[in-house]
Amino acid sequence: MKMKAFLMFVLLFLCSMGTKAQDLGANYNENIDYPITEIEMLKQSKVSWVRGFVNIPNLFLQNENGKIVGVKENAIRTHIPTLKFIQAKKALGDRVKFILSLKIPFELYTDTVPKVGTKEMEYIFQATEILLKTYDMAKNIEILVMGNEPEWENALDTDLCHADGEDYRAFLNEFANRLTTWKQTNGWTFDIYAGALNRVSELPKSETVPAVVSVVNNNPNVVGLDLHVHALKINQAEDDFRIIRDKYGVTKKLICTEFSMVRALNPHVADALGEWGTKHGYTAGMKIYEYLNLIAEKANAGTPVSATEFKSLFESYSWYPKNWYKTFYEVFKKYDTYAITGRFSVVPGGARAVYDANTEMWELGGIYFSRYLGLDADGFYNPNPLLYPDFIAARDGLAVSSLVGGQRELFIRWGNGADKTGILSVTDENGTEVVRRSLDSENDYTLVENLVPGTAYHVALLKSDDAV
């Protein structure tokens, strides 16, 4: 008999607070043409969101001598990755919502952030409006994010203290207002977010952070803020979200479209395998990047190493932040993060085709490995054993969100993982079933009464047909 069960004593007062599981998604960064190639994997993973970004200046603006001088209209209207992004949305249907972030690195230009009303700014808006109309992009996205890590992309110096904060604030306000006008004119329904701020707890002197936050807090056309967490320490996610909520007073929705601990991993890419290496058939002096190259070759040859071996290597190091995905997810829940999109897979090839001592280990932050552990029976990438168990637990949620036990009653609040078509079964310590009832699909809680103090009860959620 299939069941989700737990054991408790009702004479104890139990109180376990929980929140609804947050919606997880897949982030593809600039590779917006790639989700269409992973449709079946996306369906199998049951993600709720897909996110990508478009670099407006690099792709769609004309640049001469550090000035924006025009719009590449034909490049926008014939941009194949845009078409494939929309094709992926249509293939996945209404259950999966899409997020588009607009990356606008003003550092490319000598005047950095243009003034409101200038030709340079109008070209940015013109390119964006054409993009949103191309292939009906605007009708197929749920969220549009203005900006992508502007702390780095607006900076005039290395300490990030002088980054045209006031001009950027004016730009975002004007951008949000223009987007709202286009929405009203065209019947578009996407929500407007500002962002994406990154590593805010590390940037107390940044002009950009308070500029973006002020737009979120004060512009009624902006629904919320996008936060990126690329952390050096595992507690940084908590620090970043707390600062945004408490210091900056943001009460609107939060989303997180990128998160990783790659900065904690990168310094160790050339670490030796050491004792673990000799125990597993490698040399102690082999470096991590050499191991990664070797197992990629093995996987390509159809003889991948096991997930157990791979996981055991990284968990043998004291510096590896075990269960960091779970830790981050708990922070996302605590701060009621609306949408969360982490790295899903990594596009094979490119700059990371062969690792060396300077390669950044982004791939270790993906839910699936595109080249390390081979393919499963269905031809899909095998999952990353360092993260996948925590991803599944976070995605599915808990059957029980919270419990409160009294002397004669038990209050159960059902979590996101509960099957509301199931049967609640309560048996006493003698195996006698004292409660059997269907769950109320309209309510997230159940009250069980008339229990006997000092008695242990077994509480189970069964499938409605008691099928195995």
Label every model-predicted segment.
Residues 39, 45-66, 74-199:
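Substrate-binding cleft and catalytic face of glycoside hydrolase catalytic domains
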Residues 50-52, 100-102, 139-142, 148, ...:
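Aromatic- and acid-rich polysaccharide-binding/catalytic face
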Residues 146, 171-210, 253-263, 337-345:
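Aromatic-lined carbohydrate-recognition surfaces of secreted/lumenal glycan-active proteins
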Residues 196-226, 236, 240-241, 265-274, ...:
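Substrate-binding cleft/loops of secretory-pathway carbohydrate-active enzymes
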Residues 259-265, 270-397:
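Substrate-binding cleft of secreted/luminal carbohydrate-active enzymes
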Residues 396-418, 453, 467-468:
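Pro/Thr/Ser/Gly-rich low-complexity, intrinsically disordered linker/stalk tracts
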Residues 448-452:
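Short, flexible loop/turn segments at beta-strand junctions in immunoglobulin-like
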Residues 458-459:
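Hydrophobic beta-strand segments within extracellular beta-sandwich modules
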